[in-house]
Amino acid sequence: MAQDRKKVLVLGAGYAGLQTVTKLQKAISTEEAEITLINKNEYHYEATWLHEASAGTLNYEDVLYPVESVLKKDKVNFVQAEVTKIDRDAKKVETNQGIYDFDILVVALGFVSETFGIEGMKDHAFQIENVITARELSRHIEDKFANYAASKEKDDNDLSILVGGAGFTGVEFLGELTDRIPELCSKYGVDQNKVKITCVEAAPKMLPMFSEELVNHAVSYLEDRGVEFKIATPIVACNEKGFVVEVDGEKQQLNAGTSVWAAGVRGSKLMEESFEGVKRGRIVTKQDLTINGYDNIFVIGDCSAFIPAGEERPLPTTAQIAMQQGESVAKNIKRILNGESTEEFEYVDRGTVCSLGSHDGVGMVFGKPIAGKKAAFMKKVIDTRAVFKIGGIGLAFKKGKF
């Protein structure tokens, strides 16, 4: 019987991959399949909390937990390694720690920052990408305040922060910044009126997923707390001084001691090397989340471009969608092991909340708009639920937001 066990290989321990494994380990016996999870880090991090760690309102250590803490060691083999190649036809995955065979493969390799080719953005701006970049950014911001306080010749740029992007990540980061700045000013004896936070967005509207009423609430709240918005203002370059923007056809230099890019992500760059038809690290999947020509390969999370039946555009890359995809794939792997056909993935939209710091927010929950403290509370519920869904009540109690 042991020789008949299928090899299930899962790449990535983000929301999608880890949800797949934690659901699958409960659904199958050790005789049915050998499950291997490969992740480049020994920890999982809550990607939707990175804006907090980046601003310094949450310690970076609170954003992560060991992958093995949520695994059943008798059912799942965890390998800390970096994937270097996926060979679909040979059913092999190459890593820096060896080669792994598979019968069923789940690709959930996550996201990296996308700068859209803007000159200098990768070199001169901080990215909100992982716990390492979050730690670097939060420390850099505090170092700038400390330097300003200690310097005899004050440089106002030390207290100036530029944020590129007024989408979800950018706005949530701005909200956390407005919570963090008063603490830093108090700690280092800095006049808060000297702090300058500017958000630059190329699109004509911020938070395009929300109504004008909710957007206006977010803008008013953040402006009241010191944020200046430059909407419909493309960033054409980034340098050591800050952003270069285009206004009425002319280039302008915006100066700041801290530049942050929060305007785009893409799927893993390994996707282009491993599959055809990949755009920005995402591949269009079939309705059961497998890919054309390979019924044994599932692609989920940030690497997946899932277009619901009857729709024209793929679903966005969110933690909620990734976790639902993980659940669906776990069920389908169980069905495959039972000799049954797979079922189509059906996304249930439970709503979206954008935090504006720890005390305010905007969102749509079950089709109804919410704002203010109610939205902030709901965001904490959503964050805690995500931890609970993967790690159970113990992890939710330890890492949750309550």
UniProtKB/Swiss-Prot annotation:
<keyword id="KW-0472">Membrane</keyword>
<keyword id="KW-0560">Oxidoreductase</keyword>
<dbReference type="GO" id="GO:0005886">
    <property type="term" value="C:plasma membrane"/>
</dbReference>
<comment type="subunit">
    <text>Homodimer in solution. Forms homotetramers; dimer of dimers.</text>
</comment>
<dbReference type="GO" id="GO:0003955">
    <property type="term" value="F:NAD(P)H dehydrogenase (quinone) activity"/>
</dbReference>
<dbReference type="InterPro" id="IPR023753">
    <property type="entry name" value="FAD/NAD-binding_dom"/>
</dbReference>
<dbReference type="GO" id="GO:0050136">
    <property type="term" value="F:NADH:ubiquinone reductase (non-electrogenic) activity"/>
</dbReference>
<comment type="function">
    <text>Alternative, nonproton pumping NADH:quinone oxidoreductase that delivers electrons to the respiratory chain by oxidation of NADH and reduction of quinones, and contributes to the regeneration of NAD(+). Can use DMN, a menaquinone analog, 2,3-dimethoxy-5,6-dimethyl-benzoquinone (DDB), an ubiquinone analog, or 2,3,5,6-tetramethyl-1,4-benzoquinone (Duroquinone, DQ) a plastoquinone analog as electron acceptors.</text>
</comment>
<feature type="binding site">
    <location>
        <begin position="12"/>
        <end position="16"/>
    </location>
    <ligand>
        <name>FAD</name>
    </ligand>
</feature>
<keyword id="KW-0274">FAD</keyword>
<feature type="binding site">
    <location>
        <position position="83"/>
    </location>
    <ligand>
        <name>FAD</name>
    </ligand>
</feature>
<feature type="binding site">
    <location>
        <begin position="39"/>
        <end position="40"/>
    </location>
    <ligand>
        <name>FAD</name>
    </ligand>
</feature>
<feature type="binding site">
    <location>
        <position position="302"/>
    </location>
    <ligand>
        <name>FAD</name>
    </ligand>
</feature>
<dbReference type="InterPro" id="IPR051169">
    <property type="entry name" value="NADH-Q_oxidoreductase"/>
</dbReference>
<dbReference type="GO" id="GO:0019646">
    <property type="term" value="P:aerobic electron transport chain"/>
</dbReference>
<keyword id="KW-0285">Flavoprotein</keyword>
<comment type="similarity">
    <text>Belongs to the NADH dehydrogenase family.</text>
</comment>
<keyword id="KW-0520">NAD</keyword>
<dbReference type="InterPro" id="IPR036188">
    <property type="entry name" value="FAD/NAD-bd_sf"/>
</dbReference>
<feature type="binding site">
    <location>
        <position position="379"/>
    </location>
    <ligand>
        <name>FAD</name>
    </ligand>
</feature>
<feature type="active site">
    <location>
        <position position="172"/>
    </location>
</feature>
<feature type="binding site">
    <location>
        <begin position="319"/>
        <end position="320"/>
    </location>
    <ligand>
        <name>FAD</name>
    </ligand>
</feature>
<keyword id="KW-1003">Cell membrane</keyword>
<dbReference type="Pfam" id="PF07992">
    <property type="entry name" value="Pyr_redox_2"/>
</dbReference>
<protein>
    <recommendedName>
        <fullName>Type II NADH:quinone oxidoreductase</fullName>
        <ecNumber>1.6.5.9</ecNumber>
    </recommendedName>
</protein>
